[in-house]
Amino acid sequence: MFAIDEVASGCRFVVTDRHGGVSTAPFDTLNLGGHVGDDADAVRRNRGLVAEALGVEADHLIFADQVHGDQVVHVDGPWTGRPPSCDAIVTTRADLALAVLVADCVPVLLAAPDEGVIGVAHAGRAGMAAGIAMRLVDAMRDLGARTILGRVGPSVCARCYPVGELLREQVAELWPVTRSVSWHGEPSLDVSAGVLEQLWPHCFDVEQLPGCTVERDDLFSYRRDRRTGRFAGAVRLVEQERA
């Protein structure tokens, strides 16, 4: 169920894999995306399994309606009605787990356990270029976060993400660190490098979690498979162990 499961200083970072759910091919088995053509009941059950493993109620595992933008929304409880269209969410609620859906884009997971603030962002090429990770940090600071821990989850690597020369240069003009080349020598982008560039000046501890979605068959990848599911990166606050 979890490709990565880390408890660190009062927070828990997880990245799901594609195993342990109930969806059938090509969404087998732990698809968490409700917009990909999978059976809605299977998605609901899969999300319930992840929520249970995280120790929260099913409706307390919070997803947004991701739109490849740069908007951040403050969450104060389970959604009533349709989730808002945004690509980052923040909360101070310890009974909520925040999650983002990905299948090549970068899941950004942030926590400030000492101040009781968490946030997540879905950083695709467009969102990264627009500074979604920095906007998430700013929103967390507005809620009192000071010492921020960050985890940047698995995504498509630069070697597997060829783009046109013009697009690469447009993005690299904003974030030079993203300029790269593919396995075949084509122009490419390193989106996760751009995310890390945005986070490093503002976070106490940032780590890139290993794995390329195209190269790892235990993770969903739209670029590799097209018709496929979505995995999630999630974070929640947990009680810190007392010495």
Each predicted region: which residue ranges?
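Active-site microenvironment for binding and transforming phosphate-containing groups
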Residues: 1-243
